[in-house]
Amino acid sequence: DAFMLGGIDQNAMAAVSLATQIQFLQSMVVFAITYAVSILGAQYWGKNDKESISKIFRIGLRSIGSTSLFVALLCTFCPEMLMRIFAEEGPMVKIGAEYLRIAGFSYLLTGVSQCYLTILKITNKADLSAIIGGSAVILNIILNYIFIYGHFGFPAMGAKGAALATLIARIIELLAGILSS
């Protein structure tokens, strides 16, 4: 998102770079939980214990879901407060807050989808997990191009467009993960 915004506005690029630090922190928690789920899940997959895999998945989903929901709610309702952690008042806070209000919900979706993609990986469907994740990244880039710069009849939306592109890509990723699990 930030890279593609660099061609339009340096403030937008910097603000989104700062705003995505929130997602980076959330991603670290998600990574830790999915790592634990994958280790335990792989062991139970080897034992053909699908009931335990299901139990581990539910625990991981609840843990990631609650953490990601908390982050999404903060981003939606307190984005200025979050941005002030990284920047003083001004355009960085304003642009970053606008981005977080939209993209914040995608953080919930990303966390949940990572749980589903992890289950695909441990049940011998790692290729499908990679295709879904990679396709979501490609879709995000294409939608960034459309929404940030205003192509194909859409208005140029700048940082808000980057957030919208991220949200749409994560919705598609989650749906694909659920339908494939």
Predicted segments with their positions:
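Helix-terminus/linker motif at the lipid-water interface of multi-pass membrane proteins
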Residues: 1-14, 83-90, 146-157
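Short alpha-helical transmembrane segments in multi-pass integral membrane proteins
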Residues: 41-107, 154-181
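Transmembrane alpha-helix boundary and packing residues in multipass membrane permease domains
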Residues: 2-3, 20, 39, 80-81, ...
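Small-residue-rich hydrophobic transmembrane alpha-helices
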Residues: 13-76, 110-124, 128-129
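Interfacial/gating helices of multi-pass transporter permease domains
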Residues: 5-24, 91-95, 159-164
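Hydrophobic transmembrane alpha-helices of multi-pass small-molecule transporters
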Residues: 25, 140-144, 174-178
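Alpha-helical transmembrane segments of multi-pass membrane transporters/permeases
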Residues: 64, 119-146, 160-167
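Hydrophobic/small/kink-forming positions within alpha-helical transmembrane segments
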Residues: 32, 73, 137-138, 171
